[in-house]
Amino acid sequence: MDPNCSCSTGSTCTCSSSCGCKDCKCTSCKKSCCSCCPVGCSKCAQGCVCKGASDKCTCCA
């Protein structure tokens, strides 16, 4: 899988722990592919596990 996890909207994806997840649009993305993702983030709020502060997040910029 692409390290940026740029799969199509609604598709499945297999994000790895090292996935930067800059374009996470996967409905099945429930792994720690986002280092941080605020609750209100439209791009990374698909069940990703947040592991950092929103100011360190690049996927929602």
UniProtKB/Swiss-Prot annotation:
Pfam families xrefs: Metallothio
Binding-site positions, a divalent metal cation 4: C33, C34, C44, C48
Residues binding a divalent metal cation 5: C34, C36, C37, C50
Region feature (Alpha): 30-61
Sample GO molecular function, one term: zinc ion binding
Keyword rRNA processing: no
Region (Beta): 1-29
UniProt keyword terms in alphabetical order: Acetylation, Metal-binding, Metal-thiolate cluster
Record-listed a divalent metal cation 7 binding positions: C50, C57, C59, C60
Residues annotated for a divalent metal cation 2 binding in this entry: C7, C13, C15, C26
Residues holding a divalent metal cation 6: C37, C41, C44, C60
Swiss-Prot/TrEMBL GO biological process terms: cellular response to cadmium ion; cellular response to copper ion; cellular response to zinc ion; detoxification of copper ion; intracellular zinc ion homeostasis; negative regulation of growth
Residues that coordinate or bind a divalent metal cation 1: C5, C7, C21, C24
Family per similarity comment: Belongs to the metallothionein superfamily. Type 1 family.
Function: Metallothioneins have a high content of cysteine residues that bind various heavy metals; these proteins are transcriptionally regulated by both heavy metals and glucocorticoids.
UniProt-recorded name of the protein: Metallothionein-1
Organism: Cricetulus griseus (Chinese hamster)
Phylogenetic lineage: Eukaryota, Metazoa, Chordata, Craniata, Vertebrata
Gene designation per UniProt: MT1
